[in-house]
Design a protein with these regions (language model features):
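Ligand-binding clefts/hinges and TM-proximal coupling segments of bilobed small-molecule sensing domains
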Residues: 28-31, 43, 85-88, 164-188, ...
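Extracytoplasmic small-molecule ligand-binding "clamshell" domains
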Residues: 33-113
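Bilobed "Venus flytrap"/periplasmic-binding protein-like clamshell domains
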Residues: 49, 53-56, 65-80, 136-195, ...
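Periplasmic-binding protein-like
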Residues: 53, 131-138, 224-261, 283-297
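Extended ligand-binding regions for polar small-molecule ligands
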Residues: 72-82, 141-144, 151, 159, ...
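Acidic, polar ligand-binding/catalytic clefts
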Residues: 88-154, 238
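Short helix-initiation/N-cap motifs at beta->coil->alpha
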Residues: 88-99, 148, 185-200, 204
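A ligand-binding cleft/hinge motif common to bilobed small-molecule-binding domains
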Residues: 96, 112-122, 171-175, 203-241
């Protein structure tokens, strides 16, 4: 059962959406959050951190117009541990973040980014992931007693909404099928479609399950602003696992990436990471990560 801290999440949702609208309209933002005083600027290397402005609870702009979210909070801990740098947090769009980190406009980017071979060629992936994104199955409420995981879904011969091959979910189902050759889920590749369409297909009976990101399910079904909120009693959801997300570093910032890994290990050992997980997710999300998270995602 999902236990996100909705009091905090809903409080910032409206602000996050407004910020996202502004980003779409102007292609960027004017606000830059700095972690120390301008007087020190000349003596320190500036580290520019780009982040999405509307991805609650990972990275967003909060009600106080400050950069916030789990991934941002981890990088603010990094900033505190590396006083030789001056960190600037810059909310922006997906495209600007990816292009900017690759080109050197930004040093680091966080957006709930999964590991892919294509991205590995463009960015430095540190040893340690920064967060994780939960994926699971959305299905009809009437099947709640029958579907408890992918294995039980496969035994029912359920029809899964097609998945784009480049999506992480596709690779996860492929891995499940390799591990369960006698009880596979029929995996059909698809072209991209609007996420909210899949929920309608489930209710229509066209498909029996939608293997999707938990936040998509929450935003479409459980939030009052969701398209299917009024039909929420007709849906059920079970978690499968969490896919690691990474901070993306510019190719020239290997030293900074190495320092990130050292600080991450200290944060884990001290319990600070778990503290932040409970604050932003309401539970230990890393427990749902299987393996090291590497491989094609």
């Amino acid at each position: 059962m999902m236990k996100y801290n909705w009091k905090n999440v809903l409080a910032v949702a409206a602000v996050s959406l407004l910020t996202a609208g502004l980003l779409a309209g102007c292609g960027g933002v004017k606000k830059v959050e700095k972690t120390d005083k301008p007087a020190d600027a000349g003596a320190k290397k500036v580290v520019k951190v780009a982040h999405r402005a509307d991805s609650v609870p990972y990275c967003f702009i909060n009600k106080d117009n400050q950069s916030d979210g789990f991934e941002v909070a981890v990088l603010k801990e990094l900033a505190a541990a590396l006083p030789q740098y001056k960190f600037e947090f810059i909310p922006t769009s997906d495209d600007d973040l990816l292009i900017g980190v690759e080109s050197g406009k930004y040093d680091i980017g966080v957006k709930g980014a999964w590991y892919t071979k294509a991205r590995k060629d463009k960015f430095i992936f540190p040893k340690h992931y920064i967060a994780a994104s939960v994926i699971g199955i959305t299905f009809r409420k009437e099947d709640e007693g029958k579907i408890k995981d992918l294995e039980s879904f496969a035994k029912l011969k359920g029809k899964l909404v097609p998945i784009a091959p480049q999506n992480a979910q596709y690779a996860v189902v492929q891995q499940y099928n390799r591990e369960h050759p006698d009880n596979q889920v029929k995996l059909v590749p698809s072209e991209n479609f609007k996420v909210d369409e899949a929920y309608g297909w489930i209710l229509e009976g066209r498909y029996d399950g939608y293997f999707n990101i938990e936040l998509n399910h929450i935003n479409n079904v459980e939030k009052e602003t969701g398209k299917y909120y009024k039909l929420r009693d007709k849906f059920a959801y079970v978690r499968h696992q969490a896919i690691p997300t990474y901070a993306l570093f510019n190719k020239k910032d290997q030293q900074l990436a190495d320092e990130y890994d050292k600080v991450w290990e200290k944060l884990q050992k001290s319990g600070k990471l778990l503290e932040l997980e409970n604050k932003y997710f309401g539970f230990d999300i890393f427990k749902l990560v299987k393996g090291d998270g590497k491989g094609e995602r």
